[in-house]
């Protein structure tokens, strides 16, 4: 069974070797047929502390690393500055 992979944005990097990633999902309400956007925060392991708030990252499911961390950062793109 393949590991799940999610795409999200880093919202916090204040913990050591950990980033908090916000993952957005969209779905259609079953009764009202309106498209709704929901988000969820995941704690992910960042071994080298290389990602910062605003960076786009991909996280992959892993074995439990701590009480809250069950995801690992696989790759990422730096925040675009204009």
From Swiss-Prot:
Any one GO CC term of the record: cytosolic small ribosomal subunit
A Pfam short name: Ribosomal_S17
Example GO molecular function: structural constituent of ribosome
GO BP term, pick one: translation
Gene3D superfamilies linked to this entry: Nucleic acid-binding proteins
Keywords: Ribonucleoprotein, Ribosomal protein, RNA-binding, rRNA-binding
Transmembrane segments: none
Family: Belongs to the universal ribosomal protein uS17 family.
Described function: One of the primary rRNA binding proteins, it binds specifically to the 5'-end of 16S ribosomal RNA.
Quaternary assembly: Part of the 30S ribosomal subunit.
UniProt-recorded name of the protein: Small ribosomal subunit protein uS17
Gene symbol of the encoding locus: rpsQ
């Amino acid at each position: 069974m393949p590991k799940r992979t999610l795409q999200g944005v880093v919202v916090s990097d204040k913990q050591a070797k950990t980033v908090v990633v916000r993952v957005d999902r969209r779905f259609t309400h079953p009764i009202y047929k309106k498209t709704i956007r929901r988000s969820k925060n995941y704690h992910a392991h960042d071994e080298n502390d290389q990602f910062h708030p605003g960076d786009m990252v991909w996280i992959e499911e892993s074995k439990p690393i701590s009480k809250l961390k069950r995801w690992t950062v696989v790759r990422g793109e730096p925040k675009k500055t204009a």
